[in-house]
Amino acid sequence: DLFARVPARRKFLGTAAAESRAVIVLATHYALAYPGVSFQVVSGGRRALTTSGDGDIRHAFAAVYGAGMAAAMLNVEYAEGVVSVAGLAGPPSVHRGNRSAISVFVNGRWVQSRPLAFAVVDAYQSQLPGGRFPVAAIHIALPDEEVDVNVHPAKAEVRFRDERSVGRAVRHAITRALEGARPVD
């Protein structure tokens, strides 16, 4: 029992099922952040996640969301100033009822950033049905001095020196990927 000697920590734990879900969510995001690392998560005696670690983000995405969805994803690649954006974004036909399938990574770190999630959603403008959200795994790289990771104790939030330019780069990256996927009339 990990917290047997520290009862103050134990009281903040959720149920076993809730803690298991939190571990699976974390492992899922890091599998998408590091496709070159093999992940295997077993929960309740069953395999919840297995990735090959072959370095292909599309293969990691398939392990998380299924081969069909991975095949539908669009490649995202864009650079603007010191910001580079890469990853996968779904076409407008691939969407979810919440933002949980939007994974954003900054310099290899999974972050929960409302401005960046908004930039991803904003790139789709009116292409998604109301109340629906895109599926995406977006990797943002920029110099360390352009981002502050010491905003949250868990390092889950970041602050940018120029948040607008980072958001603009994300929007442009996804918009370009979507434009490249549209059929020509």
Where are the regions that the model predicts?
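N-terminal phosphate-binding caps/lids of nucleotide- and nucleic-acid-binding domains
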Residues: 1-185
